[in-house]
Amino acid sequence: MKRWAIASDPRTWVDAHLHLWNSSLLAPPWLAQAPHFAGKFDVSRYQREGGAAQSMVLIEADVAVADREREAQLLDAWAQETVVASTRECAIVAAIEPNRVSFASELAAMKRIPRVRGSRRVLHAGEIEFGTRGFAQDMQSLSAQGMSFDFCVRWSDLAKVDQLACELAPMTIIVDHLGNPPLRAGWNSPQAQQWQRLIARVASNGNTCVKWSAMFENAGGALSLAQARPWFEWCLACFGAQRVLWGSNWPVCFAHASLVEWIELSATLAGELTATEQDQILRGAACATYRM
């Protein structure tokens, strides 16, 4: 790969994976186990901690089922404030859960919020019912409404994502966080080799994208360029720049590293690519995927 070492300005990027919440208004249940994430994490704080993206995709934060619509409304209100205060554009990925009794009402409620462009569920904490007819049917309903779906799964479950992506083409399927690879095991580990095969299978479906995000979280801390590069370059080779989306995963990823460190590492790796590839990864792919 030819290395150009010219990084684009982070102020021109689209952050395709940003979480916002104010726990005094609505507290995700998992904050009980992560009290350091209690408080107000809004656009102003994101900017103070180094976030400078031109536009943003606001991602649901695994709130309680009863709070999902309220969360989307709060995200939409914050998005409106951001749009009014700056030239930034925002899209929302809301919590809409396939194969749940309340799915139809959740989908109808989210469709009333124009900035909602897709849905996501955190599925790495439990069993994924990909094989059920209800799950597939509800995914088809999402697709019929023009919704994409973000999968946040364990890397060992990527084969299920591959199967579903094949069945549901042309629905847009986004794999969050490079498929949560086994970074702690190391690039030369048997686990990494399994991840390589699985993420390549997912990428073979033309309706899939991958988010370049959460590497520090999966590693348990900041990474060096040498540690991060092979995982990024593998996904780039599998998906192509037009299907790789950069995201911060702020603030979730930064208990042991900073947002600035992630932006600097990302800028250096992206800076090794052509200007066209940089534009696709850092802006264009997110705009196309989330219709921004």
Predicted features, each with a name:
Residues 10-12, 52-57, 86-91, 113-117, ...:
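Short, well-ordered coil/turn segments that N-cap beta-strands
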Residues 32-87:
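Alpha-helical scaffold segments that flank or form the walls of functional sites
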Residues 1-14, 25, 31-32, 37-55, ...:
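Mid-to-C-terminal alpha-helical segments outside catalytic/metal-binding sites
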Residues 17, 56, 92, 119, ...:
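Conserved, mostly hydrophobic/aromatic
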Residues 131-245:
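Catalytic pocket-lining loop regions of alpha/beta-barrel enzymes
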Residues 69-157, 163, 211-218:
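Active-site gating/metal-coordination segments in enzymes
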Residues 21-24, 63-66, 99-102, 126-127, ...:
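Active-site environment of divalent metal-dependent phosphoester hydrolases
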Residues 13-23, 175-178:
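Histidine-centered catalytic micro-motifs
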